[in-house]
């Protein structure tokens, strides 16, 4: 995987691109990566006691073995494409917080190869909008936790020397109610108040 990432970085650098992304590599799915980044991992996978990578693939493809028998997360079409993404599950006990280092490790890996990249992460609005809620809580109940997590993400990238961060918000193409717009604006007002000089691209 590292060899493939290095080859891709070199090709993009040699092509003269102004903005080269990082964190665009995934072993399975970008939404699943974001779920693990934000600690949105159902207990049925955590309780298997697997290695981090095996736990990731249990969520992606299910697990049948000596440690248990669980189905994978549900899949849905990514908007109007033939790509399918893994649907994050959020229940009333989910503690949404920054819990993984993948985006930061890949940014540092690119720096070690002489490339200062623009990290790319699925944005908070799209993540909450596409998640499946199991219980009584809705996306609004996770406002504080998810904004805190993205502020932490920004802070870590500032410390690492990043200049740009790209937050992908494809859910903005959908018809949005007044409440949706207000929720989106509230998310980004809080986050952008704490960007510490980092340039944010949507």
Question: What are the residue ranges of the model-derived segments?
Answer:
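Domain-level signal for soluble alpha/beta catalytic cores
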Residues: 1-202
């Amino acid at each position: 995987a590292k060899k493939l990432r290095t080859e891709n970085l070199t090709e993009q650098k040699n092509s003269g691109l102004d903005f080269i992304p990082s964190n665009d590599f995934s072993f399975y799915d970008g939404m699943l990566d974001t779920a693990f980044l934000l600690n949105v991992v159902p207990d049925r996978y955590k309780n298997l006691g697997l290695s981090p990578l095996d736990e990731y693939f249990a969520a992606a493809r299910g697990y049948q073995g000596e440690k248990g028998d669980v189905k994978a997360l549900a899949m849905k079409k990514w908007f109007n494409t033939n790509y399918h993404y893994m649907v994050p599950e959020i229940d009333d006990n989910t503690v949404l917080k920054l819990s993984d280092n993948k985006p930061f490790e890949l940014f540092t890996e690119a720096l070690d190869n002489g490339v200062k990249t623009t990290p790319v992460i699925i944005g908070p609005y799209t993540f909450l909008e596409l998640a499946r809620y199991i219980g009584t809580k809705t996306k609004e109940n996770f406002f504080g936790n998810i904004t805190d997590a993205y502020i932490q993400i920004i802070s870590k990238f500032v410390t690492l020397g990043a200049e740009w961060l790209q937050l992908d918000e494809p859910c903005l193409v959908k018809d949005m109610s007044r409440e949706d717009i207000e929720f989106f604006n509230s998310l980004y007002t809080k986050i952008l108040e704490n960007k510490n000089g980092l340039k944010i691209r949507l």
